[in-house]
């Protein structure tokens, strides 16, 4: 959006490795310290409400400059976004990347999930326009928060494909029987389905190996499952892997798997495709929308480890299938998920919000 000549300012929380006021590719980024960092981690909603006090105070560093639209990303910044909306008399646009109801399979447990769901509901009510990243999420947000369908807009996520491109043309030659997956290690990400699929392939593909990168609250349970199923020699939990190391890993991999049980969009699918890795995804949420009918990847029913194993075997044992998927994926990324196209669509939502 900055490349198109628009002034963009981002409010965020501070990080020890970055400054509190800097320009990044034409975008001014202001960062605030958390207001009450001593609050226990299980007081998540209170911690975020506290941090929003500091986010709101960042407005004082803008001087006389004022935006025309406020854009909030998820419930985490709902308080500051709504306060600035009232203070400046501006329209509010809210992007909902995922919902607590969706993460819990359509049910909202008591406690923190119920509190977050309430903030999500309030944010979408206060916003003039709402953005969701897939048709699946448009339905979930519209129905779950009882919104007018005219208020909810589809704007897909995107990536900078140049950050993931291989220095050499990708092909199946020299690729290992290696399966790579990465992301937050949470139950809904379905990594437990992948480990079962790898075990199912032990005798069919004796040289198969799998690396799962990432951190999360489900990590200990996933390691326990790996130990109990006796696939520790096949599956490695690598923890956090920096992007440059992940890109090197993707140059060797035979395929990327995104086995999510719930996935509003699935940015990792685009990253895998951009790196030239044949990509297999669960037929769920936004993941299915990315791949369905494009030939850019293979699909399996979420939770079905046997179906996933068959997809992995198909890609690893048929180089022509893998190469065809790469070609289709490159075309898909170039036509649908560029930042310029996404910025133009987002600008249209801003104008809609300004019109009321």
Model-inferred region functions:
Residues 261:
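Aromatic "clamp/platform" in nucleotide-sugar-dependent glycosyltransferases that forms part
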Residues 278-282:
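Short hydrophobic beta-strand element within catalytic cores of glycosyltransferases
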Residues 314, 321-335, 345:
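A short, well-ordered alpha-helix in the C-terminal region of glycosyltransferases
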Residues 293, 298-305, 314-320:
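Conserved acidic donor-binding segment of nucleotide-sugar-dependent glycosyltransferases
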Residues 223-241:
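Nucleotide-activated donor-binding/catalytic signature segment of Leloir-type glycosyltransferases, i.e.
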Residues 171-198:
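Conserved donor-binding/catalytic core segment of Leloir-type glycosyltransferases
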Residues 240-241, 248-253:
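Short alpha-helical donor nucleotide-sugar binding micro-motif in glycosyltransferases
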Residues 14, 136, 158:
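Carbohydrate-associated surface elements
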